[in-house]
Amino acid sequence: MKKIVLLAAALLLAAASFAQSEYNYQKRSLFEQLPIRGNDIVFLGNSITDGGEWAELFNNRHVKNRGISADRSGWLLDRLDPIINGHPKKLFLMIGTNDLAVGIAPEEVAANVEKLLDRFAEESPWTKIYVQSILPVNGVDTKAKPKNHWKKGAEIIETN
């Protein structure tokens, strides 16, 4: 019986590590309803992107923020269709910080970015893509950041 309980707990913990948040699902649903058009400039990524008021900063209504806090490269691949189908003029991509924080290998992050680039090359070749490097995360103000984010300097360098 003890083994069954331990196995069940391990399975639940494993599933939780792959689970997306309610916030993620809500943002994905919202983005599926908001169209991307051919003259749009899309910012795609995680919380760094999500937190930016890009349309206001650039004073351009064609700038669309498609960042979702805590997003990972694999999850991002699952939500590309509405963006690719809109054939945006430009795409700015910043992803990978959260992948590295949960132990996803730099090679897997790079492979996911390559898959994204391949899809755009095939389905929206006129979209100009800017792949932004993963920003370094230091140990300053570690109480406000999960510790797994600020111990990944080597992985960030390798991924970039």
Model-identified regions with their sequence ranges:
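Charged helix-capping and loop-helix junction motifs
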Residues: 106-116, 153-160
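Positively charged n-region of N-terminal signal peptides that target proteins for export
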Residues: 1-4
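Serine-esterase "nucleophile elbow" of acetyl-processing enzymes
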Residues: 18-90
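Substrate-gating cap/lid alpha-helix
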Residues: 139-160
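A short helix->loop->beta-strand "cap" motif at the edges of active sites that frequently abuts
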Residues: 124-128
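Cell-envelope and extracellular/periplasmic
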Residues: 67-71, 92-100, 114, 134
